[in-house]
Amino acid sequence: MKSIPFTLLFVTAAILGAATFVENARGTAFVREYAYATWWFKALWMLLAASAAVVLVRRRMWRRPAAFVLHAGLLVVFAGALLTAFTGHKGLLHLRQGEPASSYVDEKKRVAHLPFVLTLDSFRVEYYAGTSAPSDYVSQVACHDADGTLIARPRISMNRIFSAEGYRFYQSSFDEDLKGSWLTVNHDPYGTAVAYTGFLLICIGSLGLLLDPRGGFRRLLRHPLLRKGGLFALLCLLAVDGQAAEPLPVVRRAQADSLAARQVMYNDRVAPLNTLCRDFVQKVYGRSVFRGLSPEQVVASWMLYPEEWNRVPIIRIKNRELRERLGIRGEYATLAGLFDGTTYKLQPLWQQEMGKHSQLGRAIQETDEKAGLALMLTQGTLVRPLPPGTPRLSEQQVRAELLYNRIPFNKILFMANLTLGFVAIGLFLYRMLKRRGENRTSRRLWTAALWLSTLFHAAGYMLRGYVSGRLPLNNGYETMQFVALVVLLTACLLERRFPFVRPFGFLLSGFTLLVAHLGEMNPQITPLMPVLASPWLSWHVSLIMISYALFAFICLNGLLAAGLMARPQHRHDALVRERVEQLTLLSRLLLYPSTFLLGIGILLGSVWANVSWGSYWSWDPKEVWALVAFMVYGAAFHRRTLPWLRRPLAFHLYMVAAFLVVLMTYFGVNYLLGGMHSYANPS
């Protein structure tokens, strides 16, 4: 009986993962109709919950209050989800200015009636100062009861809902003439409240398991191999181009540099001209320096001498087939070379590749974007002065952004950390094989290097936050930066007692920053979309990213432990056995905060989703894979029910395999499946 819940747990996790791939192939409507909304899917969850409840009772879990509250919270959340599924209703309400409405269309296209009347007084789009980037969408509404008595005049906007008599209204869309507004209607009188109660119980239970003196986490902290050192502090964390260059008319360096601090409109925000120039040259040429010229020199010279600069090979085309089709030698094309008289050479090529999703098609799109930027520059539409009345950046803000642009924090760090990481792991393995300890001078030097790397990265990350005016967690590039920072901080807290954590910290942060540098992530600083301007989102992303960083440490622990146990003589080597035991204990210890942070992060994301668009769960691929990760890591705590997890090798291999789910959650969804949470997939 005790193994039935875990059999159902793994079966459910496998079905959830498979459903995301079916959704990617057949569409969201298909997978909802044939999976998420089916009787057998609900029955599977009910069986899982019922079997878990039976085990809780048979084991008298209430004798362990923290664990009981946590598991009870999970069951309460499930009960809330069932109530939402069977008693909740959602739909859309269309309001036109001055026209009263008392009904809406539900998800099944049926007309449902409201016990009151709503009238749209006005709708407006609010923008970031001096830009065309929306900061909010606002509906001013009047609410009257059936007798015509005014109940309220609410302001409904993104992340600001209106509730009346069990109905909640969320800003969803608007009419093009700005005289109509679409509101999402959610009537869930029981499910949401019950689910939120479960959320609270899960948080209380998680905290209780961390603080319970007789709990597994505190017992691990008291283990002789882990007692020394500052481990408890973990709880407080929670070149000039070489191509031949023809003489070019170029603006003098001093003149161009004087333009760097000029404030312009860029990416729908106020920014120094240096930011625009740097991003333009990086985008078009692939590097921030062209033939030894500063970005400001390139942009200013191209604007002043367009005829000459249009014939300069500066537009990088990485795809060999496209270069051959265009008849271009080398990797760089001229803007003039993309035209044959008045004919744009990319147009017929794009018509041939449109809809094929081929590498050539993507290369054509990328080159077209670069050509478009160059044309905007020559036509004088790329550099936009500030509109009258636009608030200007302070001198301190301008200096901060110029400093951020001039110091390549990301590039310096990934190169330095990867180099130090490989050297550190080599020295660590050499000392272990030779059975030599680390001398004090070496330890101090490596510790200093780790702290310097951490402080340098923290300075760059905080500088980016100051420049953007928000917590830098808006896109894939910024979340990768945050993960690297958490990895480095964790390594700093653990390395004194566990020297093998040091190379892990360098390597993990280095590879994370390398992915951010090389991947398809956008490092430009942009304003937040209205729905993203929520503190719930910031906490949701922060906690989940911290959990991912800790899971990465557990994975590397597993790889190192498996490597040590693969040696034939490990059974007879006391030092190796002690190292393996240390790695096992450390992984089990980190499993507590990492899994709890992931779970609480998922819950906060549900609250954010409910506040923003009226649904605390929507079976988006990112949500599904985060839930799968929580289920997979949650199973690892149950060594009594799953005795094979007591064997060190099996435990470490399971942790390595579990991290593949985390990689799928972050990278797989972003680049393969898409969805509302995807940073990279245009779908």
Where would I find each of the regions flagged by the language model?
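Solvent-exposed, non-transmembrane regions of integral membrane proteins
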Residues: 1-683
